[in-house]
């Protein structure tokens, strides 16, 4: 019985990954957000926005940027990477960007 209990504890610790796995909000417009573990090696979260021809974030009726997608990346190439109409920005925190006001 003790062996079974010890085995269950070890398996639980391994499966939970002790909290070191990055979680990113995954979303393709319009909603809902789904938090998902990033694959191994992809340890940064990103958000993708629509941008106008001047490279500024395109706002919806002047209220908030239109977020197209969220996910995990291996490395960030810096703020403003992506094409002229699709801006990628990396988030500084785990599960970032769960609302239009958070980073």
UniProtKB/Swiss-Prot annotation:
One of its GO terms (cellular component) is extracellular region. Its main location: secreted. Residues 1-21 form the signal peptide. Keywords: Acetylcholine receptor inhibiting toxin, Disulfide bond, Neurotoxin, Postsynaptic neurotoxin, Secreted, Signal, Toxin. The keyword Signal applies. It is found in: Secreted. GO terms for molecular function: acetylcholine receptor inhibitor activity; toxin activity. It comes from the Eukaryota. Disulfide bonds join 24-45, 27-37, 38-72, 76-90, 91-96. InterPro entries: Snake_3FTx, Snake_toxin-like_sf. Expressed by the venom gland. Gene3D superfamilies: CD59 (2.10.60.10). Interacts with high efficiency with both neuronal alpha-7/CHRNA7 and muscle type nicotinic acetylcholine receptors (nAChRs). Tested on human alpha-7/CHRNA7 nAChR (IC(50)=42 nM), T.californica muscle receptor (IC(50)=31 nM), L.stagnalis and A.californica acetylcholine-binding proteins (IC(50)=333 nM and 3.4 uM, respectively). Belongs to the three-finger toxin family. Ancestral subfamily. Orphan group XVII sub-subfamily. Negative results: does not bind to muscarinic acetylcholine receptors M1 and M2 (CHRM1/CHRM2). Is unable to compete with alpha-bungarotoxin for binding to nAchR at concentrations up to 100 uM. Is not toxic to mice at doses up to 3 mg/kg. This is Toxin BMLCL. It comes from Bungarus multicinctus (Many-banded krait).
